[in-house]
Regions:
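Eukaryote-biased recognition of intrinsically disordered, low-complexity regulatory segments
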Residues: 1-23
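Residues in well-ordered beta-strands of folded domains
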Residues: 6-8, 25, 85-87, 98-102
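Short, contiguous acidic and Ser/Thr-rich linear segments
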Residues: 20-32
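Ferredoxin-type iron-sulfur electron-transfer modules in oxidoreductases and energy-metabolism complexes
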Residues: 31-50, 97-248
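Short, structured protein-protein interaction patches enriched in aromatics and acidic/basic residues
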Residues: 53-65
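Functionalized membrane-embedded alpha-helices
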Residues: 62, 68-70, 221
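Glycine-rich phosphate/adenylate-binding loop and adjacent beta-alpha elements
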Residues: 70-94, 99
Length: 248
């Protein structure tokens, strides 16, 4: 396939960015989107042009690094996949593809398509864990009965990879789906009950301090989430937050 790529280029967070156009030829439909970007960068280097900076790591849909806004959709036109799992067979010969970074005030551009998502790390650090010494002195997890429905819901929430697609696709740049997934995965399990009150209060507080917008229930985040995280988690977090405020 021969394609035209319109790519956001920006030297750093303080620089003025712009869309640059690059033609690319002989793209195999079997390539992943990132492999196509690798080929483009080889082409640019050969022409003496600075290669396009973009995040990537596992290339298996696990790490959440490969976040790109492709033709107006987080991770591109496919559903329940990350950018690295998107294949070029989803596009046609002669297509023009516009590629931008995930845009949000809380995700400043580092360079080109790479953004700083450390805001998610700080939210996670505020309470997205169970702070218990588990160095060999805890009872076997199988000794604590957990309803399968709750276990499945907790597992579904825990599949969140923190890619930021929910923020990028939300008109308010809300991080509610991400935070609610991290709250829910512990709210549904007995191990998470001890710190439940502090967890939800601290994580929501940190989310607000990072500058994310609020949720207005458009549902766009669930649609474009590569792991299909449900809006049910936002409702659960709201209940946890209300309960924590009443207790506090």
């Amino acid at each position: 396939m021969n394609l035209t790529l319109k790519i956001w280029r920006q030297a750093n967070a303080d620089a003025t960015g712009s869309i640059e156009t690059y033609p690319i030829e002989n793209v195999s439909p079997d390539m992943s989107f990132l492999e196509m970007m690798d080929v483009l960068n080889e082409q640019l280097i050969g022409q003496g042009i600075d290669p396009v900076a973009f995040d990537h790591d596992c290339r298996e849909g696990i790490c959440g690094m490969c976040s790109m806004y492709i033709n107006g959709e987080a991770h591109g036109p496919d559903r329940l996949v990350t950018t690295c799992q998107l294949h070029m067979r989803k596009f046609k010969d002669g297509d023009t593809i516009t590629i931008e970074p995930f845009r949000a005030n809380a995700f400043p551009v580092v360079k080109d398509l790479a953004v700083d998502r450390s805001a998610f790390d700080r939210i996670q650090h505020a309470g997205g864990f169970v702070s218990v010494n588990t160095s060999g002195n805890t009872q076997d997890a199988n000794a604590i009965p957990i309803d399968k429905h709750d276990a499945d819901k907790a597992f579904d929430a825990a599949t969140c990879i923190g890619c930021g697609a929910c923020v990028a696709t939300c008109k308010n740049a809300s991080a509610m789906l991400f935070v609610s997934a991290k709250v829910s995965q512990y709210a549904l399990l007995p191990q998470g009950q001890v710190e439940a009150t502090d967890r939800v209060l601290n994580m929501v507080k940190q989310m607000d301090e990072e500058g994310f917008g609020n949720c207005t229930n458009t549902g766009a985040c669930e649609v474009e989430c590569p792991k299909g995280i449900s809006l049910e988690n936002i409702a659960r977090m709201n209940r946890e937050y209300l309960s924590a405020n009443v207790k506090g």
